[in-house]
Amino acid sequence: MSVNMEDLRHQVMINQFVLAAGCAADQAKQLLQAAHWQFETALSAFFQESNVPSAQHHTHMMCTPSNTPATPPNFPDALAMFSKLRTSESLQNSSSPAASNACSPPGNFNPYWASSPPNQQPVWLPPASPTTHLHHHHHHPQPVWPPNSQPTGGPQKAMAAMDGQR
């Protein structure tokens, strides 16, 4: 059985065009033939046709794109909803569920991975790793609470006592 490679290539291009544009196969074939099988040219023609209706295009039925990632069901409505979301985020405080869900990190997010602000010690340190007890000479700076007060030595004595118990 011999298959004409040119026909096969055209069929593959038609299928790709249908997937990319969301139109019918016969319309894809017409556009590709008109563009001399130049995929990008035909795709541009398809989207320019669907965006700029003119009198000559009303004689044949136009196939509008289906719901593809490139073409949402109703693009103006999607844009309006997106702009409302942005506006409502900036106008509402973060206690509203819509704004907090839109801006909140996921539940397993650890906010302490980031560095502390300059000229300020961290208020919380992550727990020591299981291998830390092997390295007694590595001491982490002690957190200061409240942030603007000076350490009195009490927490350091407690840490020294804990190190002695290990």
UniProtKB/Swiss-Prot annotation:
The record's section on CDD domains has: UBA_F100B_like
Superkingdom assignment: Eukaryota
Question: Disordered: where is this region?
Answer: 120-166
Query: What Gene3D superfamilies does this protein's entry cite?
Result: DNA helicase RuvA subunit, C-terminal domain (1.10.8.10)
Which InterPro entries does the record cross-reference, listed alphabetically?
UBA-like_sf (IPR009060), UBA_8 (IPR054109), UBALD1/2 (IPR039310)
Q: Which family does it belong to?
A: Belongs to the UBALD family.
- Which PANTHER family does the entry link to? UBA-LIKE DOMAIN-CONTAINING PROTEIN 2 (PTHR31993:SF6)
Q: What is this protein called?
A: UBA-like domain-containing protein 2-A
Name its species: Xenopus laevis
Q: Which gene encodes it?
A: ubald2-a
